[in-house]
C-alpha cells in the first residue's frame, strides 16, 4: 500500500514539475534576430536589453494615445558601411518590463542615386539570402507609388516576408527607408 502511494506521489510531483517548466518556457519571449547587418538587437528584447546591447539611445519618444508604445533612436549607426539612423519600436509602455522590440526602422541617405540603387540591391540580396530558407518565404517588388497612401516621390518598394520577419524597403530619390517587423 505504501509503495502505491509513493509511486502516485512521485508521478504527481513529476507532472507538477513538468507543468511548471512548461509555464516558465512559455512565458519567456523568443528572441528572433532583426536581420539588419551589424545589428545585435533581436525581436523580443526589452528596453534594458536593447540599451545593454546597442548602447544608450540618442533619443526616445513615447506614444500613449490609441497605440501605446515607445521608440529608441540611434542616429550614428552603420548599415553595410553606410551611415544610418536606426529606431526600435516597442509595444507597451516604457516603464513596463513586458514591453518588447516589435519593429526596427532604418533611414539612410546617399549623395547619388547610383549609391542608393547599389544599397537597395545589397539590402535585398542580404535579406533574400537570410530568409529564403524560412517557412512562408515570399518576395514582391513594385515600381513607383502603387497604393493611394504611397508618397508620390516613391521610386520603388520591395517586400520580403517569411514566418519569422517581414522586411519592407522603400526607395526614394537618394534615400532608402527599411522596416523590419517580427512575426513571432
Regions found by a protein language model. Give the residues of each.
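N-terminal Sec-pathway targeting helices
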Residues: 1-17
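Membrane-interface motif at the C-terminal end of an N-terminal transmembrane signal
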Residues: 19-33
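N-terminal leader/targeting segments
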Residues: 31-93
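Generic beta-strand hydrophobic packing signal
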Residues: 60, 102-104, 163
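Short, ordered beta-strand-loop transition motifs
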Residues: 61-68, 94-97, 137-143, 168-172
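Short beta-strand micro-motifs in enzyme catalytic cores
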Residues: 67-73, 145-147, 176
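Long, charged/polar, surface-exposed segments that mediate recognition or autoinhibition
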Residues: 81-146
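An acidic-aromatic pocket/loop used at catalytic or ligand-binding sites
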Residues: 109-111, 148, 152-184
